């Protein structure tokens, strides 16, 4: 934000055109700021600008609708302006926000692109602000962060999670053809879609075994292991009848530090489960994600320098199955719309950003 503000001031003294000033400031930001980011700023009396880092690691979309009521450009006195906007515009990190506000999704902002909505004219301006931009989104957006009803870079988050569950079930069947799973239970909320499809493919009943207290924040982003561990019991409570006397497969979106998983496995056993198995819709996470996710050090990661047997022992489950990286990438890539297909370069870029490899983009 400070880089952008300073660049706006400097550019404004050089060039009187506000559109060139804004885009010039964004170009400066992209030259100086390395990493994953999506910015959205309201410039008082000027307009709104949204932009995405040159690798498109973090998402941002924009939408439009026909103006309702008085079509006068906001912030401009009627007697001083004859400008009339033809459309209203909105920008957000996910398409679901655009839907709920009654707008239509136009498209994702491209990697290295900026969009400026001029408050005085109502015009929408776009410009590519980085010459070497290439789309390399973080796959964790699809695994964990995004709402299932969102569309990101042409990919339905819901469809991608269904396919994650399908591929996870296929791997379980390959590894344990004679498995004794009685019931599939999701760890709320993000894993629910994947767990539902996994249960369908495995031919086992899907049950809600945990009830979530919605007033507790996401444990993944809480500071400190002790706080996260304590919060699990405050956040979730078991329906004991779904566990008692059964061999249970718990499905989670990912297993990062293992704190939540370990506590949940204990809760399942306390509720009467005979055996507790764990399946992760994401591959083992062995390296920090430096692009805006709270995974600061390798030593926090349960998969770091451990194999699956050691991880299962550490968590306390009978066995654990992780999604294969290639299957995760394919689950997302194959969920893209026909109008916006994903090329192989985009597919391979996932592998760099998903915390499973130690190659970084910036």
Model-derived segments and their meaning:
Residues 156, 237-239, 250-256, 296-302:
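Short, contiguous acidic/charged loop-to-helix segments that flank catalytic cores in large enzymes
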């Amino acid at each position: 934000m400070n880089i952008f503000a300073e660049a706006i001031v400097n550019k404004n003294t050089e060039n009187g055109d506000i559109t060139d000033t804004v885009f010039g400031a964004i170009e400066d930001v992209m030259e100086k700021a390395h990493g994953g980011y999506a910015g959205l700023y309201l410039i008082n009396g000027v307009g709104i600008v949204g932009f995405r880092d040159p690798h498109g690691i973090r998402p941002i979309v924009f939408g439009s609708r026909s103006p309702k009521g008085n079509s006068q450009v906001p912030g401009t006195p009627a007697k001083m302006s004859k400008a009339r906007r033809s459309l209203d515009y909105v920008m957000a990190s996910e398409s679901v926000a655009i839907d709920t506000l009654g707008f239509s999704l136009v498209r994702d902002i491209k990697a290295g692109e900026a969009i400026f909505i001029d408050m005085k004219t109502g015009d929408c301006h776009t410009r590519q602000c980085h010459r070497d931009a290439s789309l390399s989104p973080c796959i964790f957006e699809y695994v964990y962060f995004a709402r299932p009803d969102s569309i990101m870079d042409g990919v339905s988050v819901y469809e991608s999670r269904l396919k994650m569950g399908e591929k996870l079930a296929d791997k379980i069947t390959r590894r344990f053809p004679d498995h004794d799973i009685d019931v599939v239970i999701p760890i709320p909320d993000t894993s629910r879609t994947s767990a539902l499809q996994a249960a369908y493919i495995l031919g086992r009943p899907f049950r809600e075994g945990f009830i979530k207290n919605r007033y507790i924040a996401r444990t993944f982003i809480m500071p400190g292991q002790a706080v996260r561990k304590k919060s699990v019991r405050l956040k979730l409570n078991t329906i004991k009848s779904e566990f008692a006397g059964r061999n249970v497969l718990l499905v989670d979106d990912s297993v990062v530090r293992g704190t939540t998983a370990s506590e949940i496995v204990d809760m399942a056993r306390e509720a009467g489960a005979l055996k507790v198995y764990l399946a992760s819709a994401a591959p083992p996470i062995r390296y920090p994600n430096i692009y805006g996710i709270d995974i600061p050090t390798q030593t926090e990661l349960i998969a770091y320098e451990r194999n699956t047997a050691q991880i299962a022992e550490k968590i306390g489950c009978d066995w654990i199955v992780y999604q294969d990286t290639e299957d995760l990438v394919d689950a997302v890539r194959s969920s893209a719309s026909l109008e916006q297909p994903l090329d192989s370069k985009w597919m391979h870029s996932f592998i760099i950003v998903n915390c499973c490899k130690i190659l970084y983009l910036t």
